[in-house]
Amino acid sequence: SGWKGMVSSHLGAIRGGVAHNGTDIVPPSVMYSLIAPSQGIVIGTQTGFANGVTQTKGNAQRGNFVFVYYGESSSGGVFVLYQHLSPGFSWKIGDTIPAGAVIGQTGWSGLCYSSHGGTGEHLHLEMYYGTQQVNPEAYMSN
């Protein structure tokens, strides 16, 4: 199936004098459903932010998010953070997300830049092997 959408900001890209700490993907449609690539366990969530209401302080900049542990690999545990989601998902810490389930829908909660125009809706994606951040683009295919 692969990834749908366009990468609008790469990991490490300089924005406002600061290196971007994730990969931004513009979805192919509004509130695009994000599907779990495999079974995972929710290790962090944040909800309660409306789309389009800019948050500028602390963790609120992340907007609504789901942080998922996908198990061990030869490089350590695989962790993925899905950020700026639309409100409405109900995952809680400790929940198991089955492979193929909807994690959430893309949105523009938190602090979203409009570098690609429009509302600023996008998925901010961060991926880690253990404590080492890796570039998720290396694992994305069309």
Question: PLM features: residue spans?
Answer:
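Short alpha-helix capping/helix-loop boundary micro-motifs
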Residues: 26-29, 87-91
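Generic structural motif
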Residues: 5, 29-44, 48, 97-100
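Glutamine-centric residue-chemistry signal
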Residues: 9, 83, 99-101
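Polar/charged, compositionally biased leader and regulatory segments
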Residues: 1-37
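Zn2+-dependent peptidoglycan hydrolase active-site motif and core
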Residues: 20, 36-87, 109-123
